[in-house]
């Protein structure tokens, strides 16, 4: 059996929900406290045993490449001033086996994944979406990507991460129709539906941005017609793959952060700041102070 060694991180979206900040800055470089969101995704991949990562970028995304490249002037300056801990933080991002490819036009997630065909070759691989941050700080819980890899080692089949969402929110996600009850958190899947209306949704199990796929997906994506939003949808291709190979779904019950919209991004930033050793105490005191002030404004 071929080991899962490679991951794809699509990062070619326009980031329109965060304009004007993302006019010249990649959305994936917006910081959660002091770390770009994409770095959290890369760290999950490495913690899961991934050895090579391809980031699919678009226009105005050069900042992502710069972040993971060495910066001699900065490193020399930190070394000269004895700021060794900061130097270690900078070095962490430059020793990773990263590759980059540009998606010329944003034609959807399926097309972004298709750009990785040569990089992947004939190996199973992981797709990790940057809008979904999974908490990997609990030492007693495997990272979600590692869970998918472990599932593949048992089933030798593609496996998609899912999570239960409120029924009224299903139109924001790809949704699975499970064939039966889960066995140890793993569902066999009947069909995959991209962003159904609530009345048409086969379940409340939503795809949440971690996919372990087999290389057969590429021949399907090459023929895939545009779907929802007139984009090439990865969910549609996975549904086609499921007709010739078994595709499973792993239910995730850990902590997931959605940083794809402003409110989700702010909640994530607040949660991470409350764990950050340099700011957590002052932030807690400020939140308490702010809460008291808000109480006084109640009618």
Curated annotation (Swiss-Prot):
SUPFAM superfamilies: Nucleotide-diphospho-sugar transferases. Pfam families: NTP_transferase (PF00483). The keyword Nucleotidyltransferase applies. GO terms for biological process: biosynthetic process; UDP-alpha-D-glucose metabolic process. Its EC number is 2.7.7.9. It catalyses: alpha-D-glucose 1-phosphate + UTP + H(+) = UDP-alpha-D-glucose + diphosphate. CDD domains: UGPase_prokaryotic. It comes from the Bacteria. Keywords: Nucleotidyltransferase, Transferase. The keyword rRNA processing does not apply. Gene3D superfamilies: Spore Coat Polysaccharide Biosynthesis Protein SpsA, Chain A. Pathway: Carbohydrate metabolism; nucleotide-sugar metabolism. PANTHER family: UTP--GLUCOSE-1-PHOSPHATE URIDYLYLTRANSFERASE. This is UTP--glucose-1-phosphate uridylyltransferase 2. It comes from Streptococcus pyogenes serotype M1. The lineage of its organism: Bacteria, Bacillati, Bacillota, Bacilli, Lactobacillales. The gene is hasC2.
